[in-house]
């Protein structure tokens, strides 16, 4: 089950029947210390999500083999499905960034996704390329520090698909 960073730290101590130790408190301090950064980034991403996905597709997929006749994104329906999926990844990576925990990505995004894509013939490498483009576009909008934070969760999705 997905947890935020706070719940994860507290549950770990609770299972052990202990008070929070210095390592746990440092983890919480780090989480709270980046809270404003994560919230500002999420706000910018939310306000620009469609543009982020559109620019990422233009950078990574638009003039590649997958968009040519016979390619996997050829036809409006397939293209729309790709855009929908990329928007979904951006949204859930944003949720994970706010929670400070990638486990929501396992539960809500990655569980069975690679197998589904393979069975449908969706080119995973092109999807990973598009996710990396989302990471680049997002970082240019939210700044270096927030971009690195968001990049952790987009990389997590890419790794889960690879």
Swiss-Prot record:
Induction: Constitutively transcribed in vegetative cells, not expressed during hormogonia differentiation in red light. InterPro entries: Allophycocyanin_b (IPR006245), Globin-like_sf (IPR009050), Phycobilisome_asu/bsu (IPR012128), Phycobilisome_asu/bsu_sf (IPR038719). Belongs to the phycobiliprotein family. Transmembrane segments: none annotated. Gene3D superfamilies: Phycocyanins. It is a peripheral membrane protein. Contains one covalently linked phycocyanobilin chromophore. Keywords: Antenna complex, Bile pigment, Chromophore, Electron transport, Membrane, Methylation, Photosynthesis, Phycobilisome, Thylakoid, Transport. Its main location: membrane. This is Allophycocyanin beta chain. The gene is apcB1.
């Amino acid at each position: 089950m997905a947890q935020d960073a706070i719940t994860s730290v507290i549950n770990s101590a609770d299972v052990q029947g202990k008070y929070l130790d210095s390592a746990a408190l440092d983890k919480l301090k780090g989480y709270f210390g980046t809270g404003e950064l994560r919230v500002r980034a999420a706000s910018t991403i939310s306000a620009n999500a469609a543009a982020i996905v559109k620019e990422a597709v233009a950078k990574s997929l638009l003039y590649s083999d997958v968009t040519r006749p016979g390619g996997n994104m050829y036809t409006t329906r397939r293209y729309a499905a790709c855009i929908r999926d990329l928007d979904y990844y951006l949204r859930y990576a944003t949720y994970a960034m706010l929670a400070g925990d990638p486990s929501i990505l396992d539960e809500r995004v990655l569980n069975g996704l690679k197998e589904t894509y393979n069975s449908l013939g969706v080119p995973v490498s092109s999807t990973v390329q598009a996710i990396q483009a989302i990471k680049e576009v997002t970082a240019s909008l939210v700044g270096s520090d927030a971009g690195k934070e968001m990049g952790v969760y987009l990389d997590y999705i890419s790794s889960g698909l690879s």
